[in-house]
C-alpha cells in the first residue's frame, strides 16, 4: 500500500515537472517570436487606423454603418474555429470580401494593435503582443494597402486600456449614436443588452431579435430575413459575434444603418463597477468570464415586451 502511494506521488511529480518544462518551452518560443517581430515590423508599414474618437464622431456625423474585426474574425478568415463560432467556408469568404470593401458610409474597423501597445493594460498588451508577432504578416496580406480603417475598440474601451480616464467621455459619445432613435437589438439569447443599466435609456424605443449564443452563422438567412422586416429608419445594433460583421454589411447594402456593437454592454457593466478583472455579470452571457454558465431566465416585463422575434 505504501509502495503504491509512493509510486503515485512520484508519477504526479514527474507529470508536474514535465508540464513545467513544456510551459517553459512554450514561453521561450513565444518570447523569441515577439523579439523576431520587433525586427519584422520595421520593414512593413502598418495599416492606417483612426482613433476611437475619430471613429465615434464619424459614425455620429455620417450615420455610418460599422463592421468590426478582431482576432476572432481573423481566425475565421483563415478557417480556424473560435470559442463560439465554428469555421465555415462561406463565412471566411464573406469576411475577406467585407474587409476590402470601399463604401462611403460603411466603416471597416480593426483593432489598433499593430504599433505601440503601451496604452493597453498588461493582460491585453501581452495577448496582442503575441498575436501580432505570430500573425502580423498574415494580417497585412489580408488588408487593402492605403485603405483607411477605423477602430474596433469603439465598444471595448474600458477593460483593455491602462488609462481609463477617457472612458466616461467615450460612453457619452457612444450613446449619441442611438439618442432619440428607434433601435433594434439583434443579440444572443442571453446577452440582454441594456438590462440592469442605463446604456439605452436615451433611445426612443427598443425592439429585440434574439439569436443563438453560439454558431449564429448557421442561422444567417433567418436572421437576415427577420432584420429586414424592420423599417429602414430604425438603427440596428448587432451583438452576435462574427456574424454581425456580415449582417452589418448586408443590411447596409439594403439601406439600413447597422452597427456591430459587440461586447459594449459588458464593457459598460465593467465600467460602472470599475472592475479590475473580467467578472461575470448576473443573468448575462459573458463569453470571456464564465462563458454563459449558470445564466438564468429573467422575468423583466419591459425586456420581454421588447422581444419581437426569436431565431432558433
Residue ranges, per PLM feature:
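Ser/Thr/Pro-rich, intrinsically disordered low-complexity segments
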Residues: 4-8
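Electropositive, gly/pro-rich neighborhoods at or near active sites that engage anionic ligands
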Residues: 14-200
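Structural motif
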Residues: 182, 234-235
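Residues at the starts of beta-strands that form the adenosine-phosphate
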Residues: 182, 205, 257
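A mid-sequence, solvent-exposed acidic-amphipathic segment
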Residues: 190-233
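C-terminal functional extensions of proteins
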Residues: 246-312
